[in-house]
């Protein structure tokens, strides 16, 4: 999911952290095109679990633009749907707060790869990290497996995560 781009690093405890995820993802696609004839694949399945599923959603439209038969692409995700409510008694919408914070750090120079969704949420493009908001802008078929159980959410957004 951490596919954004931030030109300048963030210094954390004396170490520069670079956020160039979109460049890295595009370089992976370039490698597949050059070394594995990806453009002529007769079946492409993008998949991921939790944040990886969000990455698959985010990049599926881009992948369709670089293959000769866009209908050959399918997204199969295990989880990756963070429901918008105060999860397990948390004092606030933990998923929303986390996605907003992540987006404000890593998506400085670029928004998501989902242009249609970005246009639907001007100034609040972080909403596109949620399948609930980006679904209509994804052109590939999606098969959701275990969509309402996300192990990251269970472990990190529970009420115990917010105790003093």
Question: What residue ranges belong to the model's regions?
Answer:
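C-terminal His-loop and adjacent cap/lid subdomain of alpha/beta-hydrolase
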Residues: 1-164
